[in-house]
Design a protein with these regions (language model features):
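A SIS-like phosphosugar-recognition module
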Residues: 1-176
Protein backbone atom coordinates (compact mmCIF):
# COMPACT_ATOMS: atom_id res chain seq x y z
CA UNK A 1 0.00 0.00 0.00
CA UNK A 2 2.80 2.41 0.83
CA UNK A 3 4.33 1.83 -2.60
CA UNK A 4 0.96 2.60 -4.20
CA UNK A 5 0.54 5.78 -2.14
CA UNK A 6 3.91 6.98 -3.41
CA UNK A 7 2.67 6.67 -7.01
CA UNK A 8 -0.41 8.85 -6.45
CA UNK A 9 1.23 12.25 -7.16
CA UNK A 10 2.46 11.00 -10.55
CA UNK A 11 -0.98 9.58 -11.32
CA UNK A 12 -2.66 12.84 -10.36
CA UNK A 13 -0.32 14.72 -12.70
CA UNK A 14 -1.30 12.34 -15.50
CA UNK A 15 -4.98 13.17 -14.89
CA UNK A 16 -4.25 16.90 -14.85
CA UNK A 17 -2.60 16.64 -18.28
CA UNK A 18 -6.12 16.06 -19.61
CA UNK A 19 -7.59 19.22 -18.09
CA UNK A 20 -7.79 21.08 -21.43
CA UNK A 21 -10.04 18.34 -22.85
CA UNK A 22 -12.19 18.46 -19.72
CA UNK A 23 -12.37 22.25 -20.02
CA UNK A 24 -13.45 21.95 -23.67
CA UNK A 25 -16.14 19.43 -22.73
CA UNK A 26 -17.31 21.59 -19.82
CA UNK A 27 -17.70 24.59 -22.13
CA UNK A 28 -20.25 22.54 -24.10
CA UNK A 29 -22.28 21.87 -20.92
CA UNK A 30 -22.87 25.44 -19.70
CA UNK A 31 -26.56 25.34 -20.64
CA UNK A 32 -27.22 22.01 -18.96
CA UNK A 33 -30.18 21.98 -16.59
CA UNK A 34 -29.66 18.51 -15.17
CA UNK A 35 -26.66 16.23 -14.78
CA UNK A 36 -26.96 12.67 -13.53
CA UNK A 37 -24.00 10.69 -12.21
CA UNK A 38 -24.31 6.89 -12.21
CA UNK A 39 -22.08 4.22 -10.75
CA UNK A 40 -22.07 1.04 -8.69
CA UNK A 41 -20.33 0.23 -5.42
CA UNK A 42 -17.48 2.63 -4.68
CA UNK A 43 -18.17 4.33 -8.02
CA UNK A 44 -21.52 5.45 -6.61
CA UNK A 45 -19.67 7.25 -3.79
CA UNK A 46 -17.49 8.93 -6.42
CA UNK A 47 -20.67 9.96 -8.22
CA UNK A 48 -22.04 11.58 -5.05
CA UNK A 49 -18.92 13.76 -4.78
CA UNK A 50 -19.11 14.71 -8.47
CA UNK A 51 -22.77 15.61 -8.14
CA UNK A 52 -22.19 17.66 -5.00
CA UNK A 53 -19.44 19.70 -6.65
CA UNK A 54 -21.63 20.25 -9.71
CA UNK A 55 -24.44 21.64 -7.54
CA UNK A 56 -22.23 23.68 -5.24
CA UNK A 57 -20.27 25.64 -7.80
CA UNK A 58 -22.14 25.53 -11.12
CA UNK A 59 -25.71 25.71 -9.74
CA UNK A 60 -26.84 22.96 -12.10
CA UNK A 61 -29.34 20.47 -10.74
CA UNK A 62 -27.40 17.27 -10.26
CA UNK A 63 -28.07 13.88 -8.71
CA UNK A 64 -26.03 10.76 -8.13
CA UNK A 65 -27.73 7.42 -8.62
CA UNK A 66 -26.72 3.85 -8.02
CA UNK A 67 -26.67 2.57 -11.61
CA UNK A 68 -28.61 -0.56 -10.70
CA UNK A 69 -31.47 1.58 -9.40
CA UNK A 70 -32.07 3.49 -12.63
CA UNK A 71 -35.04 1.31 -13.59
CA UNK A 72 -36.83 2.23 -10.36
CA UNK A 73 -38.16 5.58 -11.53
CA UNK A 74 -34.99 7.48 -12.31
CA UNK A 75 -34.93 6.35 -15.93
CA UNK A 76 -38.17 8.29 -16.48
CA UNK A 77 -36.23 11.52 -15.92
CA UNK A 78 -33.82 10.83 -18.79
CA UNK A 79 -34.56 12.77 -21.95
CA UNK A 80 -32.77 14.28 -24.93
CA UNK A 81 -29.44 15.93 -24.19
CA UNK A 82 -29.39 15.34 -20.43
CA UNK A 83 -25.80 14.71 -19.42
CA UNK A 84 -25.26 11.35 -17.75
CA UNK A 85 -21.80 10.79 -16.29
CA UNK A 86 -20.95 7.15 -15.73
CA UNK A 87 -18.14 6.27 -13.34
CA UNK A 88 -16.62 2.88 -14.18
CA UNK A 89 -13.45 2.24 -12.17
CA UNK A 90 -14.30 -1.31 -11.03
CA UNK A 91 -13.72 -3.94 -13.69
CA UNK A 92 -16.12 -6.41 -12.08
CA UNK A 93 -19.01 -3.92 -12.40
CA UNK A 94 -18.02 -2.37 -15.73
CA UNK A 95 -20.39 -4.31 -18.03
CA UNK A 96 -23.43 -3.78 -15.79
CA UNK A 97 -22.82 -0.04 -15.60
CA UNK A 98 -22.26 0.19 -19.36
CA UNK A 99 -25.60 -1.57 -19.84
CA UNK A 100 -27.31 1.03 -17.63
CA UNK A 101 -25.65 3.85 -19.56
CA UNK A 102 -26.86 2.38 -22.85
CA UNK A 103 -30.41 2.52 -21.49
CA UNK A 104 -29.89 6.23 -20.83
CA UNK A 105 -28.45 6.75 -24.29
CA UNK A 106 -31.45 5.04 -25.89
CA UNK A 107 -33.59 7.74 -24.24
CA UNK A 108 -31.50 10.56 -25.69
CA UNK A 109 -28.94 11.16 -22.94
CA UNK A 110 -25.51 12.55 -23.73
CA UNK A 111 -22.95 10.27 -22.08
CA UNK A 112 -19.62 10.97 -20.43
CA UNK A 113 -17.62 8.00 -19.18
CA UNK A 114 -14.93 8.05 -16.51
CA UNK A 115 -12.84 4.89 -16.47
CA UNK A 116 -9.28 3.62 -16.27
CA UNK A 117 -6.70 3.69 -19.03
CA UNK A 118 -6.96 0.57 -21.15
CA UNK A 119 -10.78 0.51 -21.24
CA UNK A 120 -10.89 2.10 -24.67
CA UNK A 121 -13.94 0.07 -25.71
CA UNK A 122 -15.99 2.59 -23.73
CA UNK A 123 -15.58 5.01 -26.63
CA UNK A 124 -18.02 2.83 -28.61
CA UNK A 125 -20.71 3.68 -26.05
CA UNK A 126 -20.14 7.18 -24.68
CA UNK A 127 -19.84 10.59 -26.29
CA UNK A 128 -16.87 11.77 -24.21
CA UNK A 129 -14.38 9.84 -22.11
CA UNK A 130 -11.96 10.75 -19.35
CA UNK A 131 -9.36 8.21 -18.27
CA UNK A 132 -7.63 7.81 -14.95
CA UNK A 133 -4.63 5.60 -14.13
CA UNK A 134 -5.28 2.22 -12.58
CA UNK A 135 -4.59 2.07 -8.87
CA UNK A 136 -5.38 0.00 -5.83
CA UNK A 137 -9.17 0.08 -5.24
CA UNK A 138 -8.52 1.76 -1.89
CA UNK A 139 -7.23 4.83 -3.74
CA UNK A 140 -9.50 4.87 -6.80
CA UNK A 141 -11.72 7.53 -5.27
CA UNK A 142 -8.76 9.86 -4.76
CA UNK A 143 -8.08 9.80 -8.49
CA UNK A 144 -11.60 9.56 -9.89
CA UNK A 145 -12.98 12.63 -8.13
CA UNK A 146 -10.41 14.90 -9.76
CA UNK A 147 -11.89 14.92 -13.30
CA UNK A 148 -15.40 15.32 -11.84
CA UNK A 149 -14.31 18.27 -9.72
CA UNK A 150 -12.61 19.77 -12.78
CA UNK A 151 -15.81 19.32 -14.79
CA UNK A 152 -17.82 21.28 -12.22
CA UNK A 153 -15.08 23.89 -11.93
CA UNK A 154 -14.76 24.48 -15.68
CA UNK A 155 -18.53 24.63 -16.19
CA UNK A 156 -18.66 27.29 -13.47
CA UNK A 157 -15.83 29.28 -15.03
CA UNK A 158 -17.49 29.07 -18.46
CA UNK A 159 -20.70 30.41 -16.89
CA UNK A 160 -18.75 33.32 -15.38
CA UNK A 161 -19.36 32.23 -11.80
CA UNK A 162 -17.04 32.91 -8.86
CA UNK A 163 -15.91 29.41 -7.93
CA UNK A 164 -14.08 30.71 -4.87
CA UNK A 165 -17.27 32.11 -3.33
CA UNK A 166 -20.22 29.84 -4.13
CA UNK A 167 -23.54 31.36 -3.13
CA UNK A 168 -25.37 30.18 -0.03
CA UNK A 169 -22.52 28.00 1.22
CA UNK A 170 -20.92 28.56 4.58
CA UNK A 171 -18.08 26.81 6.30
CA UNK A 172 -19.11 24.88 9.38
CA UNK A 173 -16.96 25.10 12.45
CA UNK A 174 -17.74 23.18 15.60
CA UNK A 175 -16.34 24.54 18.82
CA UNK A 176 -16.56 22.37 21.90
Amino acid sequence: LIREIKTLPEKIEKILKDKERIQWFASKQVNAHDVFFVGRGIDYAICMEGSLKMKEISYIHSEAYAAGELKHGTISLIEDDILVVGVLTQSELYEKTISNMLECKSRGAYLMGLTTFGRYDIEDTVDFTVYIPKTDPLFATSLAVIPLQLLGYYISVAKGLDVDKPRNLAKSVTVE
